[in-house]
Every structure is written in structure tokens, then in C-alpha cells.
A protein has these predicted regions:
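Short pre-active-site segment immediately N-terminal to the catalytic Zn-binding motif
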Residues: 252-258
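Edge strands and adjacent loops of beta-rich recognition modules
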Residues: 204-216
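Active-site SXXK
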Residues: 261-274, 285
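His/Glu-based metal-binding/catalytic segments typifying zinc-dependent metallopeptidases
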Residues: 1-14, 46, 180-204, 224, ...
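Thiolate-centered catalytic microenvironments shared by cysteine-dependent enzyme domains
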Residues: 21
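Charge-rich, well-structured scaffold segments of protease-associated domains
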Residues: 1, 24-203, 281-428, 496-497, ...
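N-terminal post-signal-peptidase region of extra-cytosolic proteins
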Residues: 213-218, 246-249
Length: 577
């Protein structure tokens, strides 16, 4: 019932917390959650507001707690309908299937039920847990655990850039002078070591690994529509759901250099109102179906992800058609999204990895879509008409659709008539960008005031993406260098020197760019020593290459991990894409 209560209060754009905080532009996010544990539970109300000192907004939010408590009281007063309750039940049942798509998640679920005393795990039993929740159950837990209850309140406020010195104490640790008393139940406690060959902490003898198994490649059907849209479908009956990924190539490659972020903002606007329905109404319809439909933007593409129960596939695609082909691009939605993006950038400026990544991209790829980053200045230059013009780059001739699901091929394709009718605009994707020439080794310093450690990111341009060429071979080579906890970088900088919690190297690439990188966060005082070690490891690896043991371990790792490479629906989507 507490899960249901959290969903009723804060799930979706029609929820009271979304309406009172996000829709009203008081906050960037407002969430209600119930992170239940084995021996205890918590119920969270989390609101990420805009700072009080945003003077140009003329609105101040000094008492977040009062706003939250007033919203809770308003929810109780207005109540919820039986339709609302059925809606969140369907949504939770749909989400529960996602937890059973891999061997790992199934094993975790089965063991969790067992050691929490629930007995043997049964899918039908779990679904019935949600189905059997009543209105009385929801209100009972609300009255018992939420209404008029005390709470631990944690407010984190940013320092105002307009105030040089703080005139009052704004942070207090309630446990600063707490004296811990020893619990008498632990007096005279003696550790008794287990004599078992397999005890709770380890095996004494490492089990023999079985021979690698050839992965089972999913069967699939390919079909191209007359308007240029390419599709791939694979039937899988693991869970009663359908997963679809529509990739519209281009993304930020179409952006004006002075309006970086236009691709992202357009994708966010696609998640809002349509010409027929408000974003709140669409959110409710999707929740009723237990479906998810979301647009997002990456460097060189816009992605539409769709998840739905097989039984609701047709109704979900009706909403997809409306969102894809008939967006509204309302001024009200646009204003809120721009404001949220500006504040999001302010937050990202506190993230060392974001700052380093943005700087590295600019150094490697210069004034191109791959080197530019969204800024407050570029966001403010974007107008609604720019979004509408950018939307015209969405065309089937540069798009690919991949789907896997518990549905027949015929049933899948018969619902795609709206995509067959999607107008081909004969869009061409920009290519042949000019990147800066590679220079000798250079060091760039970014000063982040108050940083507790140094984030190191080093790299250079490298191969573009491929499945079995130089890019793939580079990935294999990188495994022993820094591809995981067994890599030389990790073993040296963490295990041997104790400079960091982790150090890794990586390759990443797409159709037009690629890079090799090394990253780690180290204690500030050992920054120079860490760099010395990294260069030493690179020199040694370049001169001597992999050892026979490392090569054997790399092969085993790739071969053994391949057995489950196409297990889950999302893994199948990635492979077919």
C-alpha cells in the first residue's frame, strides 16, 4: 500500500506534487518514493527547487517544508479515484516484469523473497499483491505513517552569488556531540569461525569455469518502408511486453553553432503536449496502460523509447502517433523547459566530470557539434520557432526502428501504418566536420573552487565505431590496460598506491568521431604522482604489450560474457540496432 501511496501522490504529470511544484515552476523536480528495506522503511518527499536568489524570477521559495506539508494536506482533501488506483496498479505490474528479464535479476528476486521470509517467489503472487490493494489500505497507511507525522528534514541550499558573507548559521549537524553508548547485548561476544568448505564470506577453492558457450543470436525480420524508414523486429516471449527504439539520426549535427542545446530542448518538448492533449492528459493515458513513451537527444541522434504491455500495444501506439506527428510546442511548456535547463546547467557546473568532459570534447573536436556544449547563453537564444524548425529534421529516411516483444510479426507491423505514412522530407545529415589537428601532449587545468579531489581526464581522438575492425580490436586491447578492476591502471593507482577508488581507460565512438580516454579521481595532494604513474603505465604497455596471462584472461572474459550478451530485451535492441 505504501508503494501505491507514493505513486498516487507523486507519479506522473497529473500528480499533485508535479502540479504544485514542477508545473508551477517552483521546482525542477518533485518526487515521492518508498525505498523499503528488510528491517526498516522510509517514505521520501524530495523537491529540487530553484534557488531563492534567482532575483530575475521575482519568486522566492523559502519554506519548502510548508509547501510539502500543504501539498500532502491537499492530496488528502482531494483524494483519489478508483481509476487512479487501477492506473498505478497497472503501471507497477508492468514495471515488475522488467525485473525479470535477466538471469541475474531473477536470481536476485528469488533469493530476496527467500531471505526476507516471504517464501518461494511466484510471479502471480507478486502481481496479486498489487491487485489486492484497496482504497482502505492506501488511506490506512497514509493515516498511520504520513499524516501529522514528524520527519527528518534535510535542506541543502546553494550559496547566493550576491552575498559575500553569510549572516547566519545555515547548517547544523544534530549528531555533532552525540555520545554513543555500548549495547550490552554485545558484551562478551566471541567470533566463531565457520568450518564449512563454503561459508558466508568465501569459497576456499575456486570453482572450475565451464567452457564458453556460443551465444544464441536472436532471430529477426527486416523490412524497409517506402518512405525510407528501416525496421527490424524480433519476437521474444520472456515477458508480456513490447520494447521499441526509434532512432532519428542527426541530433545536434543539425544545430546552429550559436544555439547549442536545440536538439535536446526539441526532444524535451516532444515529451510535452500534443495538438490534441495536454502533457498531463497523455501522462495519465500512458499510466493507465502501464506504458512509457519518451524522447531524448544524444550527440548525433534523437531517440524515442517505447515500452508497453503486449495487450496494450495498439493503444500505446495511438499515443505514440500523436506525440511523434502532432506535437504542440506550446509557449508555456517551452518557458518551463528552458528555465529547467538553465538551472540544470548551474547544477552541472558543480560536477567535475561534466566540466572535464566538456573541456575535453572542445579541445578534441573544436567548434563542431561534437565539441560544443549547451550553455546558458545558447539556451537563451533558442526560441519556440527554432524548435519548430528543428522538428522538420525528423524524417523517416534518416530513421531506424528496432523492436523486440511478446507479439507476432504480423500483429507488430499491422499497427505501424502511421509510420508508413510519415512524410519523407529527404533530409541529408551533415558530414565532413573539420576537427583541430592533434598536437603534442598538452595539460589543461580547470580550477574548481572547493574541490576535495582532482579529477583527471586525458585522451586523444581515435577510431570511429565498428563491430569487428580497428575499433573492436582497440576495445580488446584496452581490457587489460584499464577496462575494469583487473586492469593495470586500477591495480596500480588503487590497489598498490591507494590514490583512488578507481581508474579506468575507455574507447568511445560513433559514425564520425572516436576517442580514447583515461579517467580517475585522486586525492589533490597526489595529482602529480598519479599522472606520473599513468604515463609510466602507458609507456610500459606501449612498449611491451599484453602479457600472455592478460591475453588469456581477456579472451576468457569476452567469451564467457558473450553467453548472456543478448539475454534481455534491451540487450536485443542494442544488438539489432
Amino acid at each position: 500500500p505504501l508503494d501505491m501511496l507514493a505513486a498516487l501522490m507523486g507519479e506522473g504529470k497529473k500528480s499533485i506534487f508535479y502540479k504544485n511544484f514542477v508545473k508551477s515552476e517552483k521546482a525542477i523536480q518533485a518526487n515521492v518514493g518508498h525505498p523499503c528495506r528488510e528491517l526498516s522503511g522510509e517514505f521520501h518527499f524530495t523537491v529540487l527547487t530553484f534557488p531563492d536568489w534567482q532575483e530575475d524570477q521575482g519568486i522566492y521559495f523559502n519554506n519548502i517544508e510548508a509547501d510539502i506539508r500543504n501539498t500532502i494536506a491537499e492530496w488528502e482533501e482531494k483524494g483519489f479515484t478508483d481509476e487512479d488506483l487501477e492506473m498505478v496498479k497497472t503501471e507497477m505490474i508492468s514495471q515488475s516484469f522488467d525485473m525479470k528479464t535477466s538471469i541475474s535479476s531473477k536470481a536476485s528476486m528469488i533469493s530476496s523473497w527467500e531471505w526476507k521470509g516471504r517464501g518461494k517467489h511466484n510471479v502471480s503472487t507478486e502481481i496479486n499483491r498489487y491487485k489486492n490493494v484497496t482504497r482502505a489500505d492506501v488511506m490506512r497507511v497514509f493515516n498511520k505513517y504520513i499524516k501529522n507525522r514528524k520527519a527528518v528534514i534535510n535542506q541543502v541550499r546553494p550559496k547566493s552569488p550576491f552575498v559575500k558573507e553569510l549572516d547566519s548559521l545555515i547548517s547544523r549537524n544534530p549528531n555533532a556531540n552525540l555520545i554513543l553508548k555500548e549495547d550490552p547485548q554485545y558484551d562478551n561476544l566471541i567470533y566463531k569461525k565457520s568450518n564449512s568448505e563454503f561459508d558466508a564470506c568465501c569459497r576456499h577453492t575456486q570453482p572450475e569455469a565451464s567452457a564458453p558457450k556460443t551465444p544464441k543470436i536472436p532471430e529477426f525480420h527486416k523490412e524497409s518502408f517506402e518512405n525510407g524508414l528501416k525496421t527490424i523486429f524480433s519476437q521474444t516471449n520472456e515477458v508480456p511486453k513490447v520494447y521499441i527504439r526509434l532512432k532519428i539520426n542527426g541530433g545536434s549535427l543539425f544545430e546552429d553553432s550559436k544555439k547549442s542545446g536545440l536538439s535536446s530542448i526539441t526532444a524535451q518538448m516532444m515529451n510535452e503536449s500534443t495538438q490534441k492533449k495536454s502533457s498531463e492528459d497523455i501522462s495519465v493515458e500512458l499510466q493507465k496502460l502501464g506504458s512509457t513513451v519518451s524522447f531524448s537527444s544524444e550527440d548525433d541522434m534523437t531517440v524515442l523509447l517505447i515500452e508497453c504491455l503486449s495487450e496494450n500495444y495498439s493503444k500505446t501506439l495511438d499515443l505514440v502517433e500523436e506525440k511523434l506527428l502532432f506535437p504542440a510546442f506550446n509557449d508555456e511548456d517551452f518557458k518551463r523547459i528552458k528555465k529547467s535547463n538553465v538551472e540544470g546547467l548551474e547544477s552541472m557546473k558543480k560536477n567535475s566530470q561534466y566540466l572535464a568532459g566538456s573541456a575535453m570534447s572542445n579541445v578534441l573536436f573544436g567548434d563542431t557539434p561534437f565539441g560544443r556544449s549547451m550553455t546558458e547563453k545558447s539556451i537563451k537564444k533558442i526560441k519556440v520557432k527554432d524548435v519548430k524548425e528543428f522538428y522538420n529534421n525528423y524524417s523517416p529516411n534518416i530513421s531506424e526502428l528496432v523492436a523486440v516483444g511478446n507479439i507476432s510479426k504480423d500483429d507488430f507491423y499491422k499497427e505501424l501504418d502511421f509510420l508508413r505514412k510519415w512524410k519523407n522530407k529527404n533530409i541529408s545529415i551533415p558530414t565532413n566536420f573539420e576537427f583541430p589537428e592533434d598536437n603534442t601532449t598538452q595539460i589543461y587545468l580547470l580550477d574548481k573552487e572547493g574541490a576535495s579531489q582532482s579529477f583527471i581526464l586525458m585522451g586523444h581522438k581515435s577510431n570511429t565505431y565498428d563491430t569487428d575492425g580497428e575499433y573492436f580490436k582497440s576495445q580488446v586491447m584496452n581490457k587489460s590496460l584499464g577496462g575494469g578492476a583487473s586492469g593495470r591502471l586500477f591495480l596500480n593507482l588503487r590497489e598498490d598506491k591507494g590514490f583512488t577508488y578507481g581508474a579506468y581507460s575507455f574507447y568511445q565512438g560513433n559514425k564520425q568521431t572516436g576517442m580514447f580516454g583515461i579517467q580517475t579521481s585522486v586525492k589533490t595532494e597526489v595529482t602529480d604522482s598519479a599522472l606520473t604513474e599513468i604515463f609510466s603505465i602507458l609507456d610500459n604497455y606501449t612498449n611491451t604489450g599484453l602479457t600472455n596471462e592478460e591475453l588469456s584472461s581477456t579472451k576468457e572474459s569476452y567469451l564467457n560474457s558473450a553467453a548472456m550478451k543478448y539475454e534481455t530485451p534491451n540487450q536485443k535492441l542494442g544488438f539489432l540496432n
